[in-house]
Amino acid sequence: ENIVIVSSGKHPDLGALKRALVSNEQVQVTIVSPEEAMTHQATADLLVLYQPNRRFAPLLDIILDQKRNMWLISGPETDWSFLNQKQSIFSKETIGVTDEIAPEAIEEFDLFTSQWTRWADLPPLRTDIGAIAVSGPHQDLLKASIQGNILDQPIMSFYEDTERRWVLLDGVGFWTWRLEAHRLEGSYESIDAFIGSTAKYLSVDRANERLIVDHQPIYQRAIGAQIMAQYFDVSYQL
C-alpha cells in the first residue's frame, strides 16, 4: 500500500503519522510538497493532505475530477477560504482565532472498531476556531470540546458516498497524541493501529465484497450442505 502525505511545510505531525502508518510493514509512506505530489499521485493508494492551501489547487483538482479518496488534516495554517471554494463536502467558517480543542468520542460510530478508545486521556489539538459543516452521508468519530464545553461539530468525520470516501481530522498535534498513548500504555500499538484502520478505510477497493460466502455450487440430495460466511466492516476487517 502506497500512501503519500502532502504538506507545504514541516511539522512534527508528519513524522509521527509516517511512523504510525509504517508500523504496518505492508505500507510505504512518502512525504512530499504539493508540487512534488503531482508526480506521485498517480501511483498513490491514498493521499493525505496536511493543512492544504492554494498550492494544493492542481492536486485537489485531480482528486475532485477522479473522485479519489482523501484524508484531510486541517489546522491553523489551513486555507479554508480556498477549500470552501474548491469543494463542498467539508466546509468551515473560521473567525481568525486559534485555540485548543479536546476530543470527545461518539459512541454511535460503527464504521470500524477503533483500537484506541482512551480519547479523553489525550492532549488537545490546535486549530482555527469556526463552525464545520459536512454535506452528505457521514459519521463523526470525535466531537470537539473547548475548555470542557462540548461543541456540536466534529474533530474527526468520515464521509462516504457511492464514489469516494473522505476523512477530516480538524486539528494538528497528532504527535502529542502518539507520545501520550505510549506514556499511557507503554506502546504505540493501539494508536498506530487506529491510524492504520483509518488509512485502510480510505484505501480499500470499493468493488470488494463485504460478505464472502464459501460453499460448493452443487450438492447431492443425500449429503448435507455446509455454508460458511465471513462479514467484513467497511475497512474489510473481520
Set out the residue ranges of the language-model regions:
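Proline-enriched interdomain boundary motifs that mark the N-terminal boundary
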Residues: 207-214
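Short, surface-exposed ligand-recognition loops at beta-strand->loop->(often short) alpha-helix junctions
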Residues: 7-11
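Beta-strand-rich structural segments
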Residues: 221-236
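Detector for glycine-centered tight turns/loop "hinges" at secondary-structure junctions
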Residues: 147-149, 234-238
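Acidic, S/T/G-rich, low-cysteine, solvent-exposed domains in lumenal/extracellular/periplasmic regions
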Residues: 12-206
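Conserved beta-strand elements of the Class I
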Residues: 4-6, 167
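Short beta-strand segments of immunoglobulin-like
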Residues: 214-220
